[in-house]
Amino acid sequence: MQIPIRRQDRKLTDAESLSILTKGEYGILSMCTIENGGYGVPLNYVLWNSAIYFHCAIEGTKMNFIKTNNQVSFCVVGRTEILPSKFGTEYESAMIFGKATEVEGEEKREVLTQFVKKYSPDFIQEGIQYINQRFDKTRIIKIPIEHVSGKSRKE
């Protein structure tokens, strides 16, 4: 899916958009089904090998939506600053579109290791032990980036 950006003067390059995704701590996963409508959920993630990955429980709302319609979007908001005197906001954000699928085996283990490196870099060994304990109780979902876009406003 590719949705054109109306304000071309605020459009970021793909490299700038990927930089926001790389630096972000959390993003919003957006999904939709005919039966339930739209559903957005904040979660942490890693960007690795041209895909967004997130972890979740074996069962739950996210998995129910993805099983019904795996076409999703994922948005990360980077730096923001309210500009009270200008009645506006400086911001940067990036969004990707893709099809969510579950990964298993060594790819799953490597992605979980990427989570430890990103969110707990001072606890790698403990993180590996945690991965081993929770491996079978965790799903890893991959969203290969089919399209990326980003916008920013800087005064």
Residue ranges of model-derived segments:
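Short secondary-structure boundary/capping segments
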Residues: 18, 44, 64, 86, ...
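Short beta-strand segments
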Residues: 24-58, 74-75
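A generic structural signal for nonpolar/aromatic side chains embedded in well-ordered alpha-helices
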Residues: 21, 65-66, 115
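Short solvent-exposed loop/turn micro-motifs enriched in small/polar/acidic residues
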Residues: 22-24, 37-38, 87, 136
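Structural motif corresponding to alpha-helix initiation and N-cap regions
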Residues: 14, 59-60
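Helix-adjacent hinge/juxtasegments
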Residues: 61-89
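Extreme N-terminal tail/first-helix region
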Residues: 1-23
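Charged, gly/pro-rich active-site loop segments
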Residues: 1-8, 81-155
